[in-house]
Amino acid sequence: MSCVNIRGCCIGEGRPKVIIPIVEPTETAVLEKAAEFSTLRADCVEWRIDCFEGAKDLPTIVHCAAKLRVALKDKLLLFTFRTKAEGGKAALAHEEYLHFIRTVLATDCADLIDIEFFTVGAELPALIEDAHTAGAAVVCSSHDFHKTPPRAELVSRMVAMQQAGANLPKLAVMPQSRADVLELLAATAEMADRHPETPIITMSMGALGAVSRLSGEALGSAMTFANPGQASAPGQVSLDIVNEVLDALHL
């Protein structure tokens, strides 16, 4: 698997890199969490802007982003607006979403930016190129909170993300059975073995899928989300346990 190197952090090499989310509603609370998270054992902080009271107030987001970048010190910063259609807290029209992405990129604060695969559609390659021009790596994401598609579909979706130029294809799906968890893990291993051009991020959500958040080094998922006190998705494991298990399973 190839490596994405950001600020000296090699995503796709060795132990999966740990992401912790900020889901606070106000600028003051966001910055307080950032100061706290800057000292924790995690590689990357995700700002879930859809959870922010000013989620559609772009000048406020730009102002807060600059302060957040400073507060996090050397942590990687991932910007995410998770739309309601993909399980988030707020909705954006198509053009609003594109404008949001480009506004965040213009801040020069993003180490990584989440771009939703289905939300952007045909404009994905151009938007990814914009991100790369701005110096940001792209997490291209797809979420299914109802089911786990077949393995072949999961793989083809991640390959399409790669072909569009994404640095880190990401899939999060909901299992309805143990077989669904295995389907996601098999798709992850197949991608890592047969399409190693980029690292990938995968997870099976909920308690049933929690094992997928901890087995990335062995099976091919390069990053995992951990809960530092408040989860941003079903099945996130606490940060302390994630670190303990990743250490125990380190190859």
Residue ranges and their predicted role:
Residues 6-7:
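Glycine-/acidic-rich phosphate or pyrophosphate-binding loops and their flanking alpha/beta elements
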Residues 112, 117-251:
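Catalytic alpha/beta core domains of metabolic enzymes, predominantly
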Residues 2-3, 13-133, 143-147:
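Active-site beta->alpha loop and helix N-cap motifs at the rims of alpha/beta catalytic domains
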